[in-house]
Amino acid sequence: MKKIGVVLSGCGVYDGAEIHESVIALLAIDRAGAQAVCMAPNVDQMHVVNHVTGEEATGEKRNVLVESARIARGEIKDISTVKAEDIDALVFPGGFGAAKNLSSFAVKGENCDVHPEVLRLVKEFAAKQKPQAVLCIAPAMMAKIYEDAPKKPVLTIGNDKETSGKIEIMGSRHQDCSARDFVLDEENKIVSTPAYMLGQSISEVAEGIEKTINELIKLIP
């Protein structure tokens, strides 16, 4: 059975992994007959956001691995224990966690940093030419990782000019795309879809993510 790593960044759109995107990806992996292997870094979140008010919950702390375990129903690994040889493909759901906890894109834009274990695993995947999928805002993080790579990726976050502009400053090429579709970079084996960066409904987002996961699995030798 093919093993698909799913890198989570917490639990909740404003400070962690986007829950709809994560669950849709997990469902699509299962429907395709593959096994999802959930993982997350064992670090504190950048901050905690009250999802009712949208305001920062001052003084509160949450751990990315512990929060991600909610989505994974407890079946989750510390990303530091995972190597590229352990899995066949990799998926990064979106949500602000990808831009706050897996990277600092939400704060630093094109000058962001990427969590060292995320950076390591993606670079291992690139070296082994294994396929990866990035959803929603996660392509911005991928653009940073590939900033110094000889082959720059083609990515999509939909059609947001500010974010796509930052992706292109980092050297990647942005391609506009609807939430119901995906962009395939065959050379780098990276599939991306806008998800909630553009989608207005869960069904619209699901269509794009399901297509993305199916395309990702096709790329596995």
Language-model segments: residues:
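Extended, subdomain-level signal for the structured scaffold at the beginning of enzyme domains
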Residues: 1-125, 140-156, 164-221
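Short, thiol/selenol-centered motifs that function as redox-active sites or metal-ligating centers
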Residues: 134-138
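Short helix-loop-beta connector
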Residues: 128
